[in-house]
Amino acid sequence: MQTRNNFSWIKEQITRSISVSLMIYIITRASISNAYPIFAQKGYENPREATGRIVCANCHLANKPVDIEVPQTVLPDTVFEAVVRIPYDMQLKQVLANGKKGALNVGAVLILPEGFELAPPDRISPEIKEKMGNLSFQSYRPNQKNILVIGPVPGQKYSEITFPILSPDPATKKDIHFLKYPIYVGGNRGRGQIYPDGSKSNNTVYNATASGIVSKILRKEKGGYEITIADASDGRQVVDIIPPGPELLVSEGESIKFEQPLTSNPNVGGFGQGDAEIVLQDPLRVQGLLFFLASVILAQIFLVLKKKQFEKVQLSEMNF
């Protein structure tokens, strides 16, 4: 009886330990996945600087294209698509954090006019939902619903990202007006070269921090190198650490200069930004335009009928 109780107690403890481990794993994974995409959120109140530069360019140093497509005009309280395209060669592989090669990821930030925001799920049509796929968008800040971010997500599947946007209604929001508004977008493909704290990632070139002779190159067990440079002037030893990923360009005994590249530049990605314009159209103005066009068409029809009637009268008088 005692043995059976001990077995039950051990079984209960093992089950509890497994459950706790799973919970910790899930929570950790969730926090990492939620925090990782938006490095800029931690350091910048607004992703667009006063100069117009989007802050993602501070970490993604290479310049690459990005494209945005929106309707020319939208009516109030209407859901529309903002399509962001982040083109790149799908055959390319990037250096991952562990130094291995892998597929590129993409990300985007969409800066909408005040009042525009992500459409609620119950307002999104099945057609737009199909284009969205499994993407999950979030606001840059809880109080900045007009700034949306996404990523990183697999580039091979989401090089074209469809944002479902809800336009504001000036009838309910008095600070919104029927005007032409700018929309800004930034999009990156691949990992960045600089982390928010200013340190380098392994997806960039590493330069010599001193001039002299490469006296020793030590290949580290987990990848990467320790390069010892002997300063020719005072014999001082300087050690440069190269993480796994970049390919080494120098060899032992080689004379190098300060800031000379020690590695290749493995970066194949980059960041780009663009803009578009959209008009929040007054429905009454549209109705007025339609009424005007209808009036013009009717006037043309009456003129044609009147002309034909006049021609008939003239013809009858000539016959008489």
Curated annotation (Swiss-Prot):
Binds 1 heme group covalently. It holds the Pfam family Apocytochr_F_N. Heme binds at residues 36, 56, 59-60. Keywords: Chloroplast, Electron transport, Heme, Iron, Membrane, Metal-binding, Photosynthesis, Plastid, Signal, Thylakoid, Transmembrane, Transmembrane helix, Transport. The keyword NADP does not apply. Its cofactor is heme. GO terms for biological process: photosynthesis. It is found in: Plastid, Chloroplast thylakoid membrane. The chain crosses the membrane at residues 286-306. One of its GO terms (molecular function) is electron transfer activity. It comes from the Eukaryota. Residues 1-35 form the signal peptide. GO terms for cellular component: chloroplast thylakoid membrane. It is a single-pass membrane protein. The keyword Transport applies. PANTHER family: CYTOCHROME F (PTHR33288:SF10), PTHR33288. Belongs to the cytochrome f family. Component of the cytochrome b6-f complex, which mediates electron transfer between photosystem II (PSII) and photosystem I (PSI), cyclic electron flow around PSI, and state transitions. The 4 large subunits of the cytochrome b6-f complex are cytochrome b6, subunit IV (17 kDa polypeptide, petD), cytochrome f and the Rieske protein, while the 4 small subunits are PetG, PetL, PetM and PetN. The complex functions as a dimer. This is Cytochrome f. The gene is petA.
